Amino acid sequence: MIDDENLNGKEPFLKKENQLLFFLNGEKVLINEPNPELSTLDYIRSIGLTGLKRGCSEGACGSCTFMLSNVVKDDNDTFRIVHRAVNGCLYPLCALDGMAVTTIEGLGNIDKGLHSIQERISENSGSQCGFCTPGIIMALYAFLRSNPNSTQKDIEQNFDGNLCRCTGYRPILDAAKSFANQPSDEQLVELPLPPMATIDDKKDDTQMICPGTGKPCNCKTKTSHIPNKPMELNSEPIFPPFLMEYKKESLKFTGSRVTWYTPTTLEELLKIKKEKTNAKIVVGNTEIGIETRFRSIVYPTIICPTRVEELIQIQKEDNGVRVGASVTLTEMKSYLNGIIKSSENDEIANKKNGTFKAIISQLKWFAGNQVRNAASIGGNLCTASPISDLNPVLLAAGAVLTMVSLDDNGAKVRRQVPINQFFLRYRVVDIKPEEILESVFIPYTRPLEFIQAYKQSRRREDDIAIVSCCFRVLLEPIAESASNTVDSNFKIKDCVLAYGGMNVKAVTCEKTEKQLIGSVWSRELLNDACLNLESDLPLAAGAPGGMIEYRRSLTTGFFFKYFLTVSKQLYQISNGNPLYLVSDKEKSATDAYSRPLSFGEQNYQTQPDKHPITQPIKHQSADKQVTGEALYVDDVKMKSLYAVMVPSLKAHANIKSVDASKALKAPGVKAFFSAKDIPGINDCGPVIHDEEVFVTKTALFHGAPIGCIVAETHIQALEASKLVAIEYEELPAITSIEDAISKQSFFPFTHLLKDGDMEKGWSESDHIIDGEFKVGAQEHFYLEPNGTLVIPGEGKELTVISSTQNPTKTQAIVASVLGIGQNQVVCKLKRLGGGFGGKETRSIFSSCVAAIASYHMKEPVRIILDRDTDMSTTGTRHPFIARYRVGFTKEGLIKALDLELYADAGFSYDISVGVLDRAIFHSENSYKIPNVNILGRLCKTNLPSNTAFRGYGGPQAMIICENWVEKISKTLGMDSYKIRELNFYKEAEVTAYRQSVVNNMMKRVWDELMVKSNYHQRLIAVEKFNKENRYKKRGISIIPTKFGMSFTVKTLNQAGALVHVYTDGTILVTHGGTEMGQGLNTKMIQIAARAFNVPVSDVFISETSTDKVPNTAPTAASVSSDLNGMAVLDACQQILLRMEPIREKNPNVPFKQLCTLCFVERVNLSANGFYATPNVGYMFKDSGVGEGTPFNYFNFGAACSEVEIDTLTGDHTTLRSDVILDVGDSLNPTIDIGQVEGAFVQGMGWSTLEEVVTFPSGYMFTRGPSTYKIPGFNDVPIEFNVSLLGDAPNPKAIHSSKGVGEPPLFLGSSVYFAIRQAITAARLENNLTNWFDLQSPATCERIRTSCLDNFVLQFRKQ
């Protein structure tokens, strides 16, 4: 970065064409010869601004969002400033010239004060792990800068380019909506206490909790701490005046591999293109950026056309609108919206806007906001994606494209190409090498012309289409009534049916169109059209994209929707002609999806006499996280080398040879290390030593590390890693759980649990059912990928800074791999950007890689896994297959369960034994079953080793259980809630593993939820809705959970803590747990503050480190507060006991003075606390009758969810979810409610949206947010109510509390079971009353095909 003296002086500044100038957070930046291959994210992080996070590198998570501001000239030659949120990971550094960049650091910080957005997100508990937070704040900030008069609904719909895995989104939305300048069309949602709370102050009716301080007060006023107040724009930083006068000239930047051009005229652009015909045109880099990053494609010449006036204009013409090819999708949408709005009161003009409305309807679901803000219409067309959202719309509309080039004399030559001739084959279009796309002409719609667009994807927001389409028909009155459209019949004069996702390119259906033209618009044409669509849109078995039956049924289902939509309009036009009558039951099929404003409430109980325990105190690091000052591993400012693993590209193969010679010659490369370079033991198995750090002979999964490349930068190491040549001898691979079962590929391990007398159970049963149920995998998708920084010290000392839930295990295995003592390795961290179990063991192998490299290089080495590497190598939640047999009475009482559980462990054990054990323990969920026989087996496959994930096998077993409960309900014709109630454990009843269920809150939770959710009234309303609607169906389900709390391995139920009290009265706490967003540090601070009776501000936690607290258990199993809290309390009590004699002599002195007096008296004010959970531990026996008690106590909860499905597409919406969870006396209701909401949404995603797809070759297809879909802002329940059960103290844990992280996750499956009820209602329309299997997750494909109507049956294999 160069700061030229003229930049800040008064003399004219003359910039060279190889210099890049922009403003960064208000300061001028000038770079000589910038690297054309650098993204904005790469550059900004390289200069030490770490608020932008690298979450995915494909523009789909929003962690790297920043605000880009620039001056735009309008048609009337006026200038306006445009602010937009864009993705730093894709937006090129070289495209910033003349613009202003604002990152999170430019908004506010702790020292100078928080921006109002930062403050409200922080105060409203909108940040847990914090990794996604800066990006979310910048998305909101940019939106409010551009849209200061936004409604709450406008704001709520702005986050489609951002993801959060922790919060469940509700607190973020509440904080964001407080900036609305005006209410939405719907009733304004007032924002109550943070979190939106109904507070029940136990034991003191006169006191309330002040939302500002979290302390008791007596004002008796529940005042919102989050004001409903717009952002004050006049106090925001102004756009740099320097840039208002900045002359945008041509640029040329030359890098080692790529040359970047920014021309200013069309002639200049065409001249470059004529000379360099292979040049790529880049506007937003949203496609080229993916190709260069993930496919290692190098484009030597890049041309950025955003300064060429002809390409950035939009013009109205007599017959339509002409859009310049470089116009962004957001700009186009805004322009078209303006046309529509201006003609709202002009019926004739408004009828011309049909195509514009169709485009806007598709843009709503096109990628995310940040991508639309950068991507251009021309780029979308020229990419020619076969699953494009917009191309079918433009095909149907009859758009015309203009190409332009220079002839040999330098004259411009233009060529018109109708869009139906533009797409030639897969990603090949009719553009000559010297041509560019100049503009797109979009015609107006004509009278009696109807155009409608549709799209179905796995997730509504920011997802690629499974099928997209657009239909246009031009009707004319039949001759005898042509003089008057009233009461007339109509026939089709012209039509286009355009589809994406059904061929290698976007296509039209010529045969169907030909059949339709001349036909009378009536129901009779539907059957013929559907049959012709079948032949027009063939898909062979095994076609790319899969889902053959589903995709084909969408083609006809969408046309049926379109037919109803047009008919409904014709019914009005024709004055009620019965030919066009759409029945009341059918009408909802024509409704476009429109999400109401979300809302809800959070209820909890506090106990003022326990302050600060039970108080809603915000996250300790919230302010740091909202300002971007919270540091994660990759943010540590230390010069280091970078390591990248070299993976096996085969799922099962002997490694015959490895040649790194070419890689070692690449720029910046320092070394290549493999198994022969490991000084200690080549083993990183966390429990059973069956994993190699680097493969010695045989790769056991696709992605297995063969070695690592070390280079000066991550990009250099990544590129060089692809140059390592590996010769394989491929071996047969097992890549699915079904394949493992059929081939008997199991680990030599089984666990059996038996209770009662199975023969007696069967004999007492009036009915016996059996079946099989499959539970899919789930990717953790923590926003911060795995990362480690290893710093060598004196001799063989190493400091390992790792994003891990398991510092002690990391320390131990790194020491073993290096052949040194654990006393020479310190593992430490401040926080993780999410974990969810995925960093309990799988983080360790990347730490070992960095440690090996650092050991040899004698330099700091950093390894940060790219998202695709992380997802494809670190394992998932275990998928399960269950085979069950259940006996029950005619009254619904369950008598016997025979269950076989098969879990896919992957290629190694990892901690799969513990996962399977917990699944076995939770196979009965909340129900007393007197006779059980449960066998668990681990399948061995050539896939990444699966690992811990929130719930640790419990959710898989419980969803299996609830599936057969539904089958019991179906068999008996009883409501499923009655089956559940009838079989609940009663107080002190004993489980199959011989543990008494004491302090049983299940029935109480259930009964309260029945009332709070209005279950019975809503069940009636759902039935009424289903009778009145044919193609939209609703379902409602109420689901319980009983979750055992403890590690099932006895040894892990221990914790340590170190507490220091200083003479100024402040306290430093260190404990063995890791902070990953769950608020553990905040709770530990509360416990220490309570013990010493000091404000929470006097207690501080800096980090977790193995040289402060050694030999710790991983932060997992939802008991970290239980374990570490007791250890902290123990240390505090030791110190207090030592202080007591001094206190007795000085009873009235403040705590600070007491500390000084203790020091004077030589009292030790430091203590090492320890806690071990008593009376826990369980050992399975071959007989099936084990020994011990696996759990310290149980959590109880229940959730009721109501959904609506579209039976023609499989789309679903969660209308309402009510959750009640027993957390004892909550240590911190704000934290705990956040955990409940986040876990619920994660569980909802696991059981509905999130599908891990692995090819038969072992290659994982879902390796990033573009292919793997976690819930987004749009997916959370529209009404979301969460309550913490009151008056339920738990005598088994710290301050009568309970752990909270895992138990709520399974309750998200209430959405899955509500979907099942809705599908059942849909099947009844087709007289299908038999049981049907609905495997988990209930994806849109499974929902649609399970509805089993004629549209599905048309394509079902016989």
UniProtKB/Swiss-Prot annotation:
Its EC number is 1.17.1.4. It is found in: Peroxisome. One of its GO terms (molecular function) is flavin adenine dinucleotide binding. Homodimer. It comes from Dictyostelium discoideum. The keyword NAD applies. This is Xanthine dehydrogenase. Its cofactor is FAD; Mo-molybdopterin; [2Fe-2S] cluster. Pfam families: Ald_Xan_dh_C, CO_deh_flav_C, FAD_binding_5, Fer2, Fer2_2, MoCoBD_1, MoCoBD_2. The active site is at 1302 (proton acceptor). [2Fe-2S] cluster 1 binds at residues 56, 61, 64, 89. Keywords: 2Fe-2S, FAD, Flavoprotein, Iron, Iron-sulfur, Metal-binding, Molybdenum, NAD, Oxidoreductase, Peroxisome. It catalyses: xanthine + NAD(+) + H2O = urate + NADH + H(+); hypoxanthine + NAD(+) + H2O = xanthine + NADH + H(+). The lineage of its organism: Eukaryota, Amoebozoa, Evosea, Eumycetozoa, Dictyostelia. Coiled coil: none annotated. Belongs to the xanthine dehydrogenase family. Substrate binds at residues 840, 918, 952, 1048. CDD domains: fer2. GO terms for cellular component: peroxisome. FAD binds at residues 281-288, 366, 376-380, 389, 437, 455. GO terms for biological process: xanthine catabolic process.
